[in-house]
Amino acid sequence: MGVPALFRWLSKKYPKIISSVIEELPQEVNGEEIPVDITGPNPNGEEMDNLYLDMNGIVHPCTHPEGKPPPANEQEMMIEIFKYTDRVVNMVRPRKLLMIAVDGVAPRAKMNQQRARRFRSAQEAREQDEKKQEFQRMLAKQNGDKEQMLQEEVIQKTWDSNVITPGTPFMDILAASLRYWIAYKLNTDPAWEKLKIIISDATVPGEGEHKIMEFIRSQRASPEHDPNARHVIYGLDADLIMLGLATHEPHFRVLREDVFFQESKQRTCHLCGQPGHKAEECRGQAKEKNGEFDEKGKGATLKPFIWLHVSILREYLAAELYVPHQPFPFDLERALDDWVFMCFFVGNDFLPHLPSLDIREDGIDTLIAIWRDNIPLMGGYLTQDGRVDLKKAQLILQGLAKQEDAIFRRRRQAEERKLANEKRRKQEEKARNEERARKRRRSSPSYDAIESPTHAKPRSAGAAAAPPAGLELITPARGELARQTRELTHSMVVNRGNVYRANMANKSAAAVLKSKLLGGQDGQPSDDGESTAESDAQLDAAGPVLGKRKADEAEVGQLGTETPDKPEPAKADELPPDTVRLWEEGYADRYYEQKFGVDPQDKEFRHKVARAYAEGLAWVLLYYFQGCPSWTWYYPYHYAPFAADFVDIGDMELSFEKGTPFKPYEQLMGVLPASSNHAIPKVFHSLMTEPDSEIIDFYPEDFPVDLNGKKFAWQGVVLLPFIDEKRLLAAMSKKYPLLTEDEKARNTVGRDVLLLSESHPLYQDLVSNFYSKKQGAPKYKLNMRVSDGLAGKVEKNEAYIPHSSLVSSLEEYGMPSLEDDRSIMVNYEIPKSTNIHKSMLLRGVKFGPPALDNADIQATKSRAQHSGRSYGGAPFRGGRGGRMNYAGDRQSHGNDRPNPFAAHLDPKFMPGANPGAPMGMPSGWVPPSGNFSRGPPPPPRGGTSYGYGSQQYGSYGGYGQQQSYQQSSHSQSDYYGRGPPAPYNNGPADYYSGRPSGYGPQESRGGGYNRGGYRGGRDTYSSSGHGGYGRY
């Protein structure tokens, strides 16, 4: 999801959701590598059932890695992809299923973002090629014809990562290579014998992660689905966390590289400058060079992986989202859906974020605070099974609108303070350096002792000696300090920049090129997800010698001290230009005039933009919870409206036309620039390059990038014209008859495939049905007992012949062909359901002990009462009004102002008791945070009962007139926080008094915290307004 730093924000706010992956690595014995035996127990202490790979998160870093040379050709890229995938499988060790999902054709709403990203990627590749040509000229001038082979390597064009798009020959190679590698593993690796593998390649429409979510939803709809299956999804996108919550599968983890890991940079010996040991362990050994000038470098250290535990995130959110005195039953599953919905406002791949919300300013907390304060007025949750109630969303947005002016002013004040601190820090650093330089010059040996007398040049007294020509200088913290040169380093340490530049001048042009090309992109994100988008936490490799700041204090590309590797942008000591000036009066008029080019007085246009944005929010929510609601819808603006512009959106009637996805070539023509036309069949090239082309305006060579108040170009808004679908398809239709047969094949819609080995119980079932003398139906439904829990239909794959040879195109890279392929491949069809996916836990879920202790719960509750109010004034007062200053005017301190977050509440409003209840929920009670879905648990029988009104939850089974809660005086102390906290956090005591533990490994049967949410009772989903939901 388009929220850079979301992952980091979550991990800092909810620290226990992150843990390190324990990985067993292959051992080397007598020069031979011994692979890991993954048939053994998982070293992480829990066995995993299903592993899902969002494959683009593997393909991108393997094909154009950061910090090391890229693979030389596409064959080497495939080998890197195999190695990386094998490593991920070995650390997770799935026991039942592996699903590999490659991005196919995306919905139209995503193509706008893809188009901007690919145009910018092509622009960066062109700049890289220009740099290479410049260095090639330097090389030729310096070495003549001596290094002809190296010259040819240098001028090689930068590999175009835009080919990682459906419909290109590269994606064809990737699909065929994955099928070969999976079949090879099934034939040769005993650990894969019982594993089922589903491959959904780029010919299958849909984004990889959403194809995975569709599969999970389809399995949950099956009566025989295991509610306690352990799921792991690998990927770099932050939206995997939201999608994990949206599945409502409690045993869910996200696996990803630790993008903040910088061991090689932080753990460097300060004596010799080499990584891998501390100063006290230094042996003074010379650094081993790789290349004549050490320009090659060692292979990058394997990055560690981390788990993000969605189950623990559920626990945190259970404590944070529970609102005391809310007039309707607490339902964690629906509260989680509301939380996911609110995250969309700070950014996603389909809509720009609202101007007043930023993840680094705790924008999500701001919305949660407004949501908590308005819960009593809303009378229910914002969302229901992927559909948003726009009347309730209107309340949230109007609450935010009242804060917008204060948010913009405080943001500017924070930027100015930060800039002032940065200037002060640099001035202090400069003063310290100058003072130390003066002291060290008096005690340092002169460079004249080394200079040749005939070449020595006179210099003024006290001036630093110039480095002698041809001398390889030693850069502190960059390499070893030889003994004979150590005496020189006193005066050199304060002139690091000059030393570094001198070293660069003494390197050969090839070494300079190698160093610069491997130096990165100035903190610029690439296509491979959030690993680089979250580079705000990453510091430069060479930290300051005379002091170091925390990574948290450094912005993207902005360091506290000079770093010679990456020159600071122009005017680094000034704030970026911003003509809208959101912090000044009249900002809304300037915003719409400059960003949208409309008359500032045209209020209706503002409301039109807001309605389109509200429609987009509804589209995104459905996309996450039910699947793509429309393949053709998109948000038709580059910028978002202000919260104040959402007027009367509650009256909107939303409907989406499903439509059909683009064909692969249509998406290519819609998202690729003309410079990437090598990935598109030649018959379409003229449409992108010829001046008289009817769609030439879709492919500008130069395009504006609006920094929009940001500092770096990659943070700006790419202002490209939106694709007119009708014009594009009309122009392409004239060229389709000219395609070759191979090109036509790449433009078709493909099928998911299922692969398994002959050792799997399902193998014989498939062979007897498709390849025996008495063949069965061409398509049949899987028996889930035989398939080990896999639901769906299978169909014979015409390209597969049993026990034929497995041909490899990578034999020269150690991937051999096999004479007898003992695996099977069939087409697989995900089961379709006519019912919507319900936001609930399933009957039979078993939970382990909670990960959060009482201190964690109390801390989370306390933060929930106060967080998100940085721009609004006083703390929350329980929704009853109080000392809340919405406009940020701190000159008045009266207690008679209404609570601004509950913007539409009567200041005298006070939530009453639950309908029919003898009392309301006392403040301070937080429910157990893992095993509940709807409301507090039923206390022991025999107490008084009270019901919740049918008008609130009449359409939901378990909350209508049939639902009641029993309560006794004894249970009140257990459930409402008046008794000791032990039943929740300390030991296996039960929430149900006198019964076995309700939070341990026992089976839940639709009661307790999952009332109305589990599949219980009569296997139907009682709903007067929604129709039956089959077994729910």
UniProtKB/Swiss-Prot annotation:
Residues 910-934, 961-977 have a biased composition (Low complexity). PROSITE patterns: ZF_CCHC. It holds the Pfam family XRN_N. One of its GO terms (biological process) is mRNA processing. SMART domains: ZnF_C2HC (SM00343). Residues 416-466, 543-579, 861-1032 are annotated as: Disordered. Residues 416-437, 563-574 have a biased composition (Basic and acidic residues). GO terms for molecular function: 5'-3' RNA exonuclease activity; RNA binding; zinc ion binding. A zinc finger (CCHC-type) spans 267-284. It comes from the Eukaryota. Keywords: Coiled coil, Exonuclease, Hydrolase, Metal-binding, mRNA processing, Nuclease, Nucleus, rRNA processing, Transcription, Transcription regulation, Transcription termination, Zinc, Zinc-finger. PANTHER family: 5'-3' EXORIBONUCLEASE 2 (PTHR12341:SF41), 5'->3' EXORIBONUCLEASE (PTHR12341). Possesses 5'->3' exoribonuclease activity. Required for the processing of nuclear mRNA and rRNA precursors. May promote the termination of transcription by RNA polymerase II. Essential for vegetative cell growth and chromosome segregation. This is 5'-3' exoribonuclease 2. It comes from Emericella nidulans (strain FGSC A4 / ATCC 38163 / CBS 112.46 / NRRL 194 / M139). The gene is rat1.
